[in-house]
Every structure is written in C-alpha cells, then in structure tokens.
Amino acid sequence: MALMPKRVKHRKSQRGRIKGNATRGNTVVFGDYGIQSLDAGWIKATTIEAGRIAAQQYVRGQGKLYIRIFPDKSVTSTPLETRMGKGKGEPDFWAAVVKPGTILYELSGVTEQQAKVCFARLASKMPVKVRFVERRSA
C-alpha cells in the first residue's frame, strides 16, 4: 500500500522550488548502509513502494530496511482535454520532496556486498541519481 498522510491541514499544496542541499536527514542513522540522493526532485509514493518491494525481495528477511522519506506533498492535476481556468485540479498523487544529500533508504543486518547489490536494484527504480553511503563511526 502506497504511503500517504492520514490527514492534512490543506489538501492542495503549491509546487514550490527545491533550493540548496539537505541539512537534515543527510546522515545514516538507523542502519549500517544507505543510499543518498545526488539530485533534487519529487519521489512519488508509488516509487517509494516499488523501491521497498525490490529491496525486501532481495534481502528476504535477513536484514531490516528503513525508509527515511515520506510523501507529504500532494500533487494536483486537471483531467485531459479540459479548458484553461476553472480552478486548481484535484490531488493526483503524493510525493516526497528530496534535496541533494537526503538519505532515502537504510539497510542493516546484511554485509556490505549484499547492501550494494540490494541498493543497485533499488536505485534503478529511483527518478534521482543516488550513491551508496556507509554509517560513519564517530
């Protein structure tokens, strides 16, 4: 089931601009390995779910997958062949706003080689460029 907020204050949001790099959510916290976004963009809830399924099919209960992004922005669209005007369209899908440096997924309980293969499968589903990162031991 695709992720979406339980309830929101406003159903329709403005598109906005994605400026700068991520200052929060840019370090591996829960797992041992992660994938980090190198581009800015929107990631649909269905895309997040497709990535989750691809990763979990590969690890098969060995490791634990953590999803670090949540689709909290509603993206609206008007029906095809509709004339201009008549207000803003209805919410079409939910998306997560991702900045460069944001950690998208984390993985624990697997070897580094397994994590790299798993994230390579997952990266093919993502609309942004990503890279493999490890947890830094302080």
Swiss-Prot record:
Residue ranges with Basic residues bias: 1-18
PROSITE patterns per the UniProt record, alphabetical: RIBOSOMAL_L16_2
GO molecular function, one term: structural constituent of ribosome
Keyword rRNA-binding annotated: yes
Signal peptide positions on this chain: none
A Pfam family of this chain: Ribosomal_L16
Keyword RNA-binding belongs to the record: yes
GO cellular component, one term: cytosolic large ribosomal subunit
SUPFAM superfamilies: Ribosomal protein L16p/L10e
Membership in a protein family: Belongs to the universal ribosomal protein uL16 family.
Subunit structure comment from the entry: Part of the 50S ribosomal subunit.
Job description of the protein: Binds 23S rRNA and is also seen to make contacts with the A and possibly P site tRNAs.
Record NCBIfam families: rplP_bact
Name of protein: Large ribosomal subunit protein uL16
Gene source species: Rhodopirellula baltica (strain DSM 10527 / NCIMB 13988 / SH1)
Phylogenetic placement of the source organism: Bacteria, Pseudomonadati, Planctomycetota, Planctomycetia, Pirellulales
